[in-house]
Amino acid sequence: MRRATARRVALLSGVVLLSGCGLIGSPKNAQAGVPNNITVTSPDVTPQGVMGSAYACHGAGTYPGIHWSNAPANTKSLAVVMDDSAAPITPYIYWIVFDIGPQTTSIQPGQIPAGARQARNSKGSVGYDPPCPADQSHTYRFTVYALGSRLRLQAGANVKLAWSAIAQAAIARGRLTANVPP
């Protein structure tokens, strides 16, 4: 019992320390050296890179379909992160899905794959936080990460803890960017 508590305290202390040093929260730092060879597409993003309003706060508020290919053969699980790197608080994370099975190649709108879990977003709620750009178009990034292990996190994990675990386990990634008009 004491060992488990000590491990939790050590892990959380590390996360707090890294957060204070600016190492967690910066997609650039987390992705340094990770190959960008996964292809990411969405039927819900136009060829011009515009995501339909159905996936924003003034629409249905569900997430769009995301498809990917070319994950490495040694992938143990996958994660999808949606963020806005230009938000006043960066990165603002709208959605994290993790422990997606390695054979899975898509997420359908409103349907999380069996066995996958969602973390909290930057707003503090579990699941997808639909974007709501106030006065100008924003660019959102859907990044698919191939992970070398499954994450040992519960559903509803803290956004920084989930982001840190994904960054540490990432072996490859791919990205789709989408604009949402106000």
Region spans (language model):
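N-terminus-centered regions that define maturation/targeting leaders and the start
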Residues: R2, R8, L17, C21-P182
